[in-house]
A protein has these predicted regions:
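Beta-lactam-recognizing serine transpeptidase/beta-lactamase-like catalytic domain environment
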Residues: 2-5, 83, 211-221, 262, ...
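Periplasmic/cell-envelope proteins involved in peptidoglycan metabolism and beta-lactam response
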Residues: 1-286, 374-386, 395, 503-507, ...
Length: 588
């Protein structure tokens, strides 16, 4: 028994040793397999496919920061600022960071932030907590630097500042309709700001950085420089723009009119020197401003031009040999197709100059009926009616122009005194700029241009010169536009009055008064159109309502630009003729 027990004991020890050896080998094998797996995984991540891990790491640490660029400045032709960008700050929150730091409390610092932003604390909390895991939300835009510095000093977790800019318009309402404005993201919304948005915007740069868990920049990876925005130099002269707006605004108020518009053009270059509307608005504070007030009426509103087209009728008649410069016309009222054609005052006969001076509907209608119906259509078109000016401003209309093949006699007659077509004030200004250049058509421009300017002769110079001289009589005693006369200067103008068309296409008992012309008449430099819409102060004729405004504006322009007086002297006294006096009472 004892011998058997002794033989079994070594056997058990041997089996136990074998078991331990087997377990050790298994453990070593598992360890080796684990090491092999880890080495394989490391090789996979580091050598074969490292991109995914790098991407995951970059997502947690890399940040792209925009390097903003300021919007370009808009200036007048002499470099005076009309629109500039001023530095401001945006206040934004990181909701996750705020939440991780304990959220919004009722402490003094959070109350101070709410007061600074003019937001009740409960509303501020609701906005930030609306998406607790979010990483970005604006709290305020375009905050002035002083307020932004105050908020920064509060050192609230998750509240950050971002640089941005805000547009400022030094001329305010004077240039509002022309310049327009931008939105909170500095995108052009109206006027030149919208039309030239790409030119003014530039291209922001980028900066890629690596941040640690606390948001601190620990490495600059790369950067792309921003492309500076372009500045824009307009054709506008800020001095003349202010003058035009002031006189127009006063006239609208004095005549209790619905609105008024005026356009001033350089005859020799086609540059728009001033473009104004009244009433206007403050582009620096748009709160409460109706959209209707933002409309640039000089390019959007159309009206029948009335008597302002009569110089072109006379030009066409002279060119076609229907009349001569010294012809005398029978201007006794007559009827066409049951409609009476008459003038404001009755004249038995008038010279060709008298037809323009007295604004005779009878005279110009007889000239029109003596020519083919296509004659006036062609002449009006040559001077730019029915065609967009392509000035580049958003919202411009090209007016309404007849395309009919057959015309009745009454349609031909009324077409000669400005009915049956519609134009914008800007289009009419282009017509008179062409008249002022003695028949040379030049494209209009809202940006400053350098001569030579593309041009095209559309009418014989001698005929246009003759008619311009005739137009001088309108502002002399006996003319319908005597109230436009300017001491010391000769001006060539035409006044007009037209009934407004209602929404149903019928004429209503409201009027538009306008005066268009060039000065100085001896060698025209400027063309000006003044439109007063629906005057309610008792007078509505162009000669009484818009002519005085024309005289005030053009007189100021000539003096501001140091144009030498050209009025004829009165003999030995060497005095300039004062083209003022009682005439037809401004009825034209």
């Amino acid at each position: 028994m004892k011998a058997a027990a002794k033989t079994q004991k070594p056997k058990r020890q041997e089996e136990h040793a074998n078991f331990i050896s087997w377990r050790f080998a298994l453990l070593c094998g598992c360890i080796l397999l684990a090491l092999a797996f880890l080495l394989g995984r490391v090789a996979w991540l580091q050598v074969i496919s490292p991109d995914m891990l790098v991407k995951e790491g970059d997502m947690r640490s890399l940040r792209v920061q925009q390097v903003s660029t300021s919007r370009g400045m808009i200036t007048d032709r002499s470099g005076r600022p009309l629109a500039v960008s001023v530095p401001v700050k945006a206040i934004w929150a990181d909701p996750k960071e705020v939440h991780d730091a304990g959220g919004i409390s009722v402490g003094d610092r959070w109350k101070a932030l709410a007061n600074a932003l003019n937001i009740p604390l409960d509303q501020l909390s609701a906005r930030i907590n609306a998406n607790p895991k979010g990483r970005f939300i604006y709290l305020a835009r375009q905050v002035n630097p002083d307020m932004a510095d105050y908020i920064k000093k509060l050192k609230l977790p998750g509240i950050h500042l971002r640089e941005e800019s805000r547009r400022y318009y030094p001329s305010g309402e004077v240039t509002a309709h022309l310049i327009g404005f931008t939105n909170v993201d500095s995108q052009g919304i109206e006027g030149v700001e919208k039309s030239f948005d790409k030119w003014l915007t530039g291209q922001p740069g980028e900066r890629i950085v690596r941040k640690d868990r606390y948001g601190r920049v620990i490495e600059d990876i790369s950067s792309t420089d921003s492309q500076a925005a372009h500045n824009l130099t307009l054709s506008i002269d800020e001095r003349l723009q202010a003058l035009v707006y002031r006189e127009l605004n006063n006239a609208v108020a004095f005549n209790k009119a619905e609105s008024g518009s005026a356009v001033l053009v350089d005859v020799n270059t086609g540059e728009v020197l001033a473009m104004a509307n009244s009433p206007s608005y403050n582009p620096n504070n748009l709160s409460g401003t109706p959209k209707e007030a933002m409309r640039n009426r000089t390019i959007t509103d159309v009206f029948e031009p009335g008597s302002t087209v009569k110089p072109m009728v006379v030009m066409t008649a002279l060119q076609r040999g229907v009349v001569r410069e010294n012809s005398v016309l029978n201007t006794v009222p007559y009827r066409i197709n049951g409609h009476e054609i008459k003038d404001v005052a009755r004249y038995s006969e008038l010279t060709l100059t008298g037809v323009l001076q007295k604004s005779s509907n009878v005279g110009v209608s007889k000239l029109a009926l003596a020519m083919p119906s296509s004659a006036l259509v062609d002449t009006y078109s040559r001077f730019g009616l029915g065609k967009a000016t392509n000035l580049g401003l958003v919202g411009e209309r090209s007016g309404l122009y007849p395309q009919k093949q057959r015309w009745s006699d009454i349609e031909r007659a009324t077409f000669s005194f400005g009915y049956g077509l519609m134009v914008t004030p800007l289009q009419l200004a282009r017509v008179y700029a062409t008249i002022g250049s003695y028949g040379i058509y030049r494209p209009l421009s809202i940006t400053k241009v350098d001569p030579p300017v593309p041009s095209e002769r559309v009418f014989p110079e001698s005929i246009v010169r003759t008619v311009v001289h005739m137009m001088e009589s309108v502002a002399l005693p006996g003319g319908g536009g005597v109230k436009a006369a300017i001491k010391g200067y000769r001006i060539a103008i035409k006044t007009g009055t037209a009934k407004k068309v209602g929404p149903d296409g019928r004429y209503i008992n409201k009027y538009i008064a306008y005066t268009a012309g060039v000065a100085p008449a001896s060698q025209p430099r400027f063309a000006l159109v003044v439109v007063i819409n629906d005057p309610q102060a008792g007078k509505y004729y162009g000669g009484a309502v818009s002519a005085p405004v024309f005289g005030a504006i053009m007189g100021g322009v000539l003096r501001t630009m140091n144009i030498e007086p050209d009025a004829l002297t009165t003999g030995d006294k060497n005095e300039f003729v004062i083209n003022q006096g009682e005439g037809t009472g401004g009825r034209s």
